[in-house]
Amino acid sequence: MVENGSLYRRLLSDVRGEVMSDPASLARYSTDASIYQMTPDAVVIPRSTEDVQAVMSIARDEGSSVLPRGGGTSQCGQTVNQGVVLDNTKHLNRILDVDVEKRIACVQPGVVLDQLNQALKQHGLWFPVDPSTASRCTLGGMAANNSSGGKSLRYGIMRDNVRAINAITVDGTEARFSAVTAASGDYADLVGDMRALGRREAAEINARFPKVQRRVGGYNIDALVGNDINMSHLLVGSEGTLAYFTELELSLAHLPGAKVTGVCHFQTFRAAMEATQHIVTLNPQAVELIDDTMIALGREIPMFSETINAFVEGNPEALLLVEFAEGSAEANAAKLVELSQLMGDLGFAFSGAEHRWGGVVSVTDKSLQNAIAEYRKSGLNVMMSMKEAGKPISFVEDCAVPLPDLADYTAGLTEIFARHGTRGTWYAHASVGCLHVRPVLNMRQDKDVRTMRAIAEETFELVKKYKGSHSGEHGDGIVRSEFHEKMFGKRIVSAFEQIKKRFDPNGVMNPGKIVNAPAMDNRRLFRYGQDYSVPEFETTLDWSAWPGAGGGFQGAVEMCNNNGACRKLKGGVMCPSFRATRDERDATRGRANSLRFAISGQMPGGLSSDAMLDTMKYCVSCKACARECPTGIDMARMKIEVLSAKRKKDGLTLADKLIAYLPRYAPKAAKVAWFVNLRNKIGLSRKLLEGPTGISARRDLPVWSSAPFRDVEAQDNDPQVLLFADVFNRYFEPENLRAAVRVLRATGFRVAVARDDRSDRALDCGRTLLAMGCVDEARHEAQRVIDATRDAVAKGVPVVGLEPSSILTFRDEFLALCPGPETEMLSNATCTFEEFLADQPDLPLKPLDRPIYLHGHCHQKAHGAVTPMLDLLKRIPGAQVHMIESSCCGMAGAFGYSPDTIDVSIKMAQLDLFPALEVAPVDAVIVADGTSCRHQIAEGTQHQAMHVARLLDMVLDV
């Protein structure tokens, strides 16, 4: 790391893009999905290739280095280094051209794979290299890594699908690397030198390079052998060490037709390994392995448990997911028959003493196939969901061997693990002999670091025995580069060094990768180095499910393995702030890294620092990460700890108090509703009040009702339903509660409002208090609810609520505020209005001839409560229900009203929600249970949304 004064000043002067050197930003770019951590000199978000050229020139002059970075999902340390990090993802992310006839695409390096394939879908094309990180990995990163995926058996790896690369070399020259025909100038000299090296080393390359498809270790110098040389193939897999990629020309493929999956079950792992070489003779496009540990862990993850139960029979020790795409349903069906016959020929059947237990579960339903594929793609993250101190560690995770040796290789590696007192979990690409396996180790302990090296050395000897590759998919980085001499020999490594020297004489481009690498077990480069520690500190919520300081808060934070699932741009909800800003700071990963630095003393000021608060600024507490992050990062809950620490340090502003104590002053405000509502009507008052209240003058506030809901409106004797009347529906939209009471009674239930008989003050979920970090007061409110509902809950009476962010607090934050059996009983008794009614068969409803568009609240999605709502709406006779596929609406309580966050709030809605409603018919019924969602829709579209209770009340047939 260089002193960054002069470097930083020059970057600020010469670069149009963003330049960052503050500790928090450097921390967020110091790690990837590997075990390593290196603090960069600066981070640059370039806007153009001119920015890139300026950075390379400045870094060269200042004695720094340059690290091109895409999604930061590398598992081997390729994308951590000192020097200047160039983040390509925010601006250099355009699809430049698509030639449909020739099936060629030209893209900038920051284009995300899923983004490209979404654009190609309309043409019936796709880019067929499909790594599991497709939702966030970039094409530039894929080329630099020589990535592959589950379908490489049919489509090959990245090198097989790159036609040309435009790149900037370290001297600032931009050149096109492609099939060699005629070349001139300096580029001709470079080509000539590389061809000479290829001729000189051809025999050694042929003798030393593994004869397996999955071989991505070192430079692709075999691409320099022969007459048909494509110079771009030398750059593929070079891990940013030779040049900066500005444009990639890619070969495309026709989208495969209908697919089917045969799930082969095996009672033993070895049986699955032995069967693989026979299964690939059926010409599937993928054969993927899942072992019993991955099945067990997946069943504990909410978003995967239902899927697993749908395709797994019994308790297999291993599954092989065999995918066929033959172009027609008939051909696919025939392949499934062949697969079943083959399994029978191999001696497997689900019944019969004469067979080994096993067989095929056929999956033809498209939605289930997609769910299975998503589960398999999340394999690493599922593995990392273990809450213990040890984690599955990547360092021998993608060795590749010939299929006939696969069973013996896996048995040998299992023996190595056992000899060192650990175990591994297996999954991934059985079809090409490249299985992912990670031994469980604790990288904080010296003994486990020594074990890692011993396992690596023994494993690579085993790989050599079977003439395999020590790097089959994930590249070299820090973790494998030092072993090239063991695997390739001195002469090949010398050739690697000559290539590096020819392209980059002074080692400016991502030094220490592929050649001249540090030791893989150098703890000074570890995320959890020898000096890493987290001193004990006080937290306000219960984190006892995890190990470590802060009552387990440390362990919860350290669950983040930097896989980057939170950087996806489509599908699900996570992470709405990142989708809006494209800033690493605003992804769940960026926040988790910041938290880790804060609690370990690596970021000044700790949890209460301004930098930490700024990191949380755009977090809307949507809870999407709690459900969609496979390692279970609950950033909304972690944000509460940050807000609590900040409040204890600095107290509350007037604006904070207006939010936090809304339930307490609401009864008084409602009495003068006419006066309070004047703020929306008088422009000057909006502007004058913006500063002290923290409410943007650009927003209308919710309108106070002059006739708020009163508890006495629903106090049936011996109630069968306890209704929680939240502050938002009680004082702003009381007709929602009245409609809910009518619907519940029409369904035959006696209804009573949950209330505190010891106080005149209405019950409160504490949500507004938590939003401002007032945890002790929120805990008091939670205990009031627990006490008030105790007797009814003990009798089995359900507690039902309308506002998702309020009622679902009972199932979530209450468990962390007041842990104990009574809270768990309340949590189990709690349901949303639609969850309760979805189980009731006798709901008298009239037909509705208007289309219904449903927007789910983030907390409904996080708790799996959208499906019951969808099912309930479909019970309306004649209903045409359309589910809006959107992330967070962006209002998120106070977030959308703040002058500091209103623009990001609107941007979130503009990504998915607003476009969906723009095409909705004018007579459509828009259903949104969240009060914030309804207000965002009202302000940003021509539609008015309603709560599902109002719609059901409207169509009641009584």
Regions found by a protein language model. Name each.
Residues 226-242, 255, 260, 267-282, ...:
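Long hydrophobic segments that form regular secondary structure
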Residues 248-250, 282-390, 424, 428-430, ...:
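Terminal amphipathic helices with adjacent charged low-complexity linkers/tails
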Residues 504, 511, 636-958:
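Iron-sulfur cluster-binding electron-transfer modules in prokaryotic oxidoreductases
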Residues 11, 34-66, 84, 88-131, ...:
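N-terminal glycine-rich flavin-associated loop
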Residues 34, 142-144, 148, 152-158, ...:
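C-terminal substrate-binding/cap subdomain adjacent to the FAD-binding core in PCMH-type
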Residues 385, 389-390, 465-470, 477-618, ...:
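Ferredoxin-type iron-sulfur electron-transfer modules and their immediate structural context
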Residues 74-77, 133-140, 213-220, 224, ...:
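A glycine-rich phosphate-binding loop feature that marks nucleotide/adenosyl-phosphate handling sites
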Residues 1-61, 71-103, 155, 241-259, ...:
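N-terminal flexible segment immediately upstream of the FAD-binding catalytic core
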